A protein has these predicted regions:
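Extracytoplasmic cell-surface/polysaccharide-interacting catalytic and binding patches
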Residues: 2-5, 10-141, 145-298
Length: 298
């Protein structure tokens, strides 16, 4: 009687184990189907769990007393590099009056890009080919106000109004690989590489997943925006949008990330910086401020 009872208990345990294993297999199968059918979710899983934050670098505010700050006239700093890389354009921030993009031709291709992104895009494109074997192509970079007006007239729900598109700056790049454009870009190895690693080259996914309430644009894994280093890596590390990053940089405060010092100050003011900086770059942000970035001398 006791042996029969023990045997029944053993069978019950085996049945429970089989049910648990079967349930786990079903869950795994469902998750696999979902990830395969929705590559943007696969991108998010990869971005969260496959090494994007393995080398976490702190981003923190640095406080300086006035006695340790030196004033600079922005217009007379010939050794500083002026860029347009951090200009914010969206539905609420239109192209500044009198804005002229700093454009140049990319590698005798006939494609016009903002000069700030030429080297970075070349490096990203080469890395895509080296790591995936695919060649990355550009479908759109610079777009005039007139071209944007025509585009919006044809598709008013998707296209931003003329004057509000990042393509006016030459800093936004729509990319694709053979047989994989638009949302299908993420189905390619190249698309997944770009969405995971573009931040290392100064680019961001300008309209990330689940941030439409902030950007006003649904997820576009093919739309890259150049903001430069270290800004792209901070944005990636914090999983925030460009809008959120601009708001993160409080005016007249100083932030330290790796070997960089970053400050956002009123555009028409005497820029105050601590000593011991080199390779200083500044860019207006289209909110009445300028973002200054410098490398800290060891």
């Amino acid at each position: 009687m006791s042996n029969k009872k023990n045997k029944n208990q053993k069978n019950n345990k085996l049945n429970i184990i089989k049910i648990i294993i079967g349930s786990l297999c079903i869950i795994l199968l469902v998750m696999t189907i979902i990830l395969v059918s929705k590559p943007e979710l696969l991108y998010r899983v990869q971005g969260s769990f496959l090494g994007r934050n393995d080398n976490h670098i702190s981003f923190k505010e640095n406080k300086y007393s006035e006695i340790n700050l030196q004033g600079f006239d922005l217009n007379s700093q010939t050794e500083w590099r002026s860029e347009q890389s951090l200009i914010l354009l969206n539905k609420a921030h239109a192209l500044p009056e009198g804005f002229v993009p700093q454009m140049a031709e990319y590698k005798d291709s006939g494609v016009q890009m903002n000069v700030a992104i030429l080297d970075a895009y070349a490096q990203l494109s080469a890395a895509v080919t080296e790591n995936t074997g695919d060649k990355m192509y550009v479908s759109s970079v610079y777009r005039s106000v007139e071209e944007q007006a025509e585009l919006q007239a044809n598709d008013p729900e998707l296209a931003l109004p003329p004057g509000n598109s990042e393509h006016h700056t030459g800093l936004a790049v729509d990319v694709y690989v053979f047989e994989h454009a638009g949302m299908n870009f993420l189905e390619s190895e190249a698309g997944q590489y770009v969405n995971k690693n573009c931040y290392d080259f100064g680019f961001i996914i300008r309209y990330p997943k689940d941030k439409e309430d902030i950007t006003g644009i649904s997820f576009e894994p093919w739309h890259l925006r150049y903001v430069g280093l270290p800004h792209s890596k901070i944005i990636q590390q914090k999983f925030i949008t460009f809008e959120e990053y601009i708001n993160l940089l409080q005016p007249n405060k100083f932030y330290h990330y790796d070997k960089y010092l970053i400050t956002r100050q009123p555009l028409n003011s005497n820029i105050k910086l601590p000593t011991g900086l080199q390779n200083i770059v500044y860019s207006p942000d289209n909110t009445g401020h300028v973002i200054v970035t410098g490398q800290i001398i060891d």
